[in-house]
Amino acid sequence: MRTLFFIILFMPFISLAQKIDKVKVFLDCSWRCDADFFQREMTYIDFYKDPKTANLHVIVNGERSSNGGEIVTFRFIGINEFEGVDNTLTVDILPNTSDDSERKFYLDILKKGVYAYIIRTSDKDNV
């Protein structure tokens, strides 16, 4: 009886200890993303071409702003182990920004957004 009590008592903690090794990203970008650049710079996460194998769906959309620049929105949607962990980050790119600076801005936003998921993995200390 005592053993059964302890099993029932600690069952929620056993399920919380489910191990998430790495963030697996499906990048869904309809706005000037350099996916190869992101993959080279962010080797601590895995990029997938199939959203069913990922645990994080990142949707990137952009639009022209009234000043001639761009407003780019990154939506981070948790899948599977990260279900319910969703975030949105936006960057405003000025009209005279170089292509290289622009992709570095995007990389910075992507890194910041993915960090919220990395800290929930067992790989967090290796980043």
Predicted regions and their residues:
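Generic hydrophobic secondary-structure signal
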Residues: 5-9, 25, 38, 42-45, ...
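Short helix C-cap/helix-to-loop transition motifs enriched in small/turn-promoting residues
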Residues: 7, 51-52, 67-68, 79-85, ...
